[in-house]
Amino acid sequence: MSQRVEQLKEFHHWTKLAQEQTGKSPVTQLKEILALRKMGGQCGISDYYNYKLYDDSYLKGRGREDFLGWKLHTQFSLALNPRSAVLPAWDKNVFTLIAGSAGLPVAPVMACFHPAAQISPILGQHLRSIEDVQKFLRNPDIYPLFGKPVYSQQSYGSASLTGYDDQCDSIVLVNGGKETIFEFSRRMVESVDTRYHKPECGYIFQKSLDLAPSLQAFTKWSAICGVRVVCLNGPQGVVPIQAMWKVAVAPNHVDNFSSGRRGNLIANVDLKTGEVSRMVDKYWPDTQVFESHPVTGVPLAGLRLPDWERVLEICHLGGALFPLMKIHHWDFALTAQGPLILELNDIGGIAQLFGGGLLTENTREFLKCHANLQEHPWVKAL
C-alpha cells in the first residue's frame, strides 16, 4: 500500500512539473496518456513523463507515435536478435576475439584472468589463478589500468586503477580510494552482484585510454566518455538510427547513465555531423537541458565528437561481421588515438531522451520484415 501511495505522489509531482514546463493542465495530460494506447509502442504514464512526451515543442518526427514504451525496451532487441547469435554482445572475450581478428579497432587487452588451460594471445597475458592476478597487480609498471569482468552489465565489477601502494599492499583507485590486493582479487571468483556479474567468464585488464583532447577539455576528467550508436542491420546494410554521448562526471570512473542515479550526463548526437546537443542528467521531468557542463561550466554549443565519420564506418564494418544480430548497440571510446570499440550490446534502453523515438516508420517496417513475429506478436500491431 505504501508503495502505491509513493507512486501516486510521484505521478502528482510529474504532473505538476509538466504543467509548469508547458502550461498543459492535468486533464490534458491524462487525455494524451490515454491516447498513447493506440500508437503501438505501449507507452504508459512513466514513458509520457520520462521522455517529455508532454512537450510538443520538444518532440521530433511524428512525435509521441514514434516512441517505444519501457515494457518493450528489452522485447525490441529480443525480437530482432536471435538468442543463438548474441554471445559476442555478452561475452567480452568472444567479441574481442572475433572483432580483433577481423581488424576492427577494439580496445586492446593487456591481461586476462581465465581458468582455461590456454587462451588466445589477443587477450594478452594469461592469468590462470588468483595468485597470478595478485602478482600482476603488484607490478607498479602496469598502471594506470582499467579492469572489468568479461560478463557483466552496468559496469558491475569494473575499476579504474591508478597505481599500487606497497606499504599496504593495495591498489589505488582513480577516486583516491584504496582496496587491498586480496579484496580486489576476490571479484575474479566471486560475483559482485549475482544479477549482472558472472565471474566464471573471466576478467580483463586494459591499459587506461586517453580521452580525445577536445572532449577532455569539456569534461576536465580522465574517465572515458563513450558514445552509443544504435544501428539496424539488414540485408541492405547498416542504418544508424540514434546516437548518444555518455559523459562521466567526477569522481565516477565509468560513464553509465543508470537513469541519472550516478550523477553522469547524457547528450544527443547528430547522426550526420556528430554534433552534441540536449544534454541532461536525469529522466524528465526532473531535469533540464544543460547549455554547459554543470560541473566544469564549459559551454556545449558547437561541440562535435571527433572522428565521427570513422565511428560510422566502423558500425558498417561491424554489421557485416555480426549479420544475424539485426540491431546493434555499439559503445565506442573516443580516444586521443581515434575511436576504439568498447563493446557491442544486445539490449539498450536510453535512446529516447532527446525528443526522438525509436519507432519511426522505417523502424516499424524493419521490425515487420526481420523480427520473430511468432515470439513477438506485438510487432504485428505496429
What kind of region is each of these model predictions?
Residues E179-V192, F218-E313:
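ATP-dependent carboxylate/phosphate-activation module, predominantly the ATP-grasp catalytic core
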Residues L8-I142, Y151-Q153, C315:
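Conserved N-proximal alpha/beta basic substrate-recognition cap immediately N-terminal to
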Residues P285-I327, L334-L382:
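C-terminal active-site "lid" helix and adjoining low-complexity regulatory extension at the edge
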Residues K92-I224:
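Active-site nucleotide/adenylate-binding loops and adjacent lid/helix of ATP-dependent enzymes
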Residues F113, P149-Y151, D165, K207-D210, ...:
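Short, flexible loop/turn elements at secondary-structure junctions
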Residues I142-P144, E200-G202, I224-R228, P240, ...:
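Extracellular structured ligand-interaction cores
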Residues Q153, T162-Q167, N233-G237, L271-T273, ...:
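Short acidic-glycine loop/turn motifs at beta-strand connectors
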